[in-house]
């Protein structure tokens, strides 16, 4: 029997391969996967081919484990390529949904021949998809925080794409009264996104949330925006000065590399200082706001009485709004 290359000194691989192939037919991918971790090769398919040539076993007509799934891998890579053209991304990862019968046959065979420390077939399938997609697109794989996640469903022969959220920080100025900060959620889905609201979660775009959301939909080709507001105001209030800060989480964005202007006029509100951030801060966000009040009195107030307002500095106060209580503190007070 002629041995070749990496197999010359490993009779154990040869003997185990003979035992396995005498019981069931395997493709080169499934055969090589059982032993590739104990060699210096990176390709299970290549190792499987070497083993088969070494022991003169015929090529399997139908693989016992995968039922020739690997012969169709290129079709799914092409599917990934076609779907990826809609998205801007640098990194990706890929997952797979296999028929349970395939996984069970793989587990059974690995247990039967005591094959320890061997990748399962699902891992091998995703590795093969990833390697081929990298060669086609030159994108980088990232298992922790990929821009795009592909999931290949081999049961339904479909490919699903999910993108990492984009996080933004910005400020808005509102120079017209009558605009609410928040929009009402879609009544059909309660803000989760459905066909009736085009997956936006809201159906009106007349307030601050709606106007900024619509702007971000167009810029990032995103479906839905979740806001974290730094404080709030009612529809009769103005937001002046540097504006009110906010955070936005963009769900399922197709665009990521968007150039953002320093200022954007959205008709009745202005947003500025808009920029990408890594994540939205956790927990309660501390902030200070400046409020201007116009007070009218029946009687004239002397300057001595007005000076007593200074006593409110550093005094905690409670505000009740919509049956919710908020604790505030007056840091500075001016009057004229």
Model-derived regions, located:
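RNA pseudouridine synthases
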Residues: 1-336
